[in-house]
């Protein structure tokens, strides 16, 4: 491990570090170097430019690497994957901060050897196979913006938007290799309303357009959260209530309609709506 950094009088500060590693499991052996770097330029607090490079390695779990088959029911099976390799994420981010509140950014993220469990309908027998596998990579390129605003003293709001281009590729997925691409938009709107000096109301909304996860298609999803806080007894006591996912819509509908596969995953569980007081 090595690390260097410096703060310059010109308003530039930077740091660079790196970690070397040798990993061995079974027949898989690999030397790897994981760099980290950051650069900040702040001539004045009104205009700040931030650049960063990061890497992160994630190892598969023990049970995921066992040579075993477990049965959910008479149709669905979970396969272990001996020799499952660790995944490595590389991310590059650039942010421009204006007046210490408006943020505009761009990013690139690539996860090499991404391991993920995906369903596959066997072409040899009547069986649904769930298996954790190493994909070639997942990759995202995107733009983001954070814009806060205020109306008087009673309404604070913040709008966040992320537009990204996703690509998922696996050349060794049973007999069904895939290389899928999708534009995805995410929007979040946070609002705080100060009704009077003792009563505050919060409202949050989130939305994501249809997305992909390997061979899966994820439909549009959205959530609405709300909360209220009352301060009384001379600001010595507070009563608050919050309801998350009011319309119970945070879990996306997931379908598989790729390469002759036909599957609809129906989410059956406790409601995602929660009320806390």
Task: Describe each PLM feature range.
Residues 163, 168, 185-231, 244-247, ...:
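C-terminal beta-barrel architecture of Gram-negative outer-membrane proteins
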Residues 1-40, 45-90, 106-129, 156-165, 186-210, 246-261:
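Surface-exposed extracellular loop regions of Gram-negative outer-membrane beta-barrel proteins
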Residues 16-18, 51-53, 104-106, 145, ...:
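Membrane-embedded beta-strand positions of outer-membrane beta-barrel proteins
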Residues 18-26, 53-59, 69, 100, ...:
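Transmembrane beta-strands of outer-membrane beta-barrel pores
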Residues 266-277:
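Single conserved hydrophobic/aromatic residue that forms the stacking wall/gate
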Residues 10-14, 46-49, 100-104, 153-157, ...:
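Repeated loop/turn-to-beta-strand initiation elements of outer-membrane beta-barrel proteins
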Residues 1, 85, 104-161, 169-188:
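Outer membrane beta-barrel strand-and-loop segments of large Gram-negative receptors
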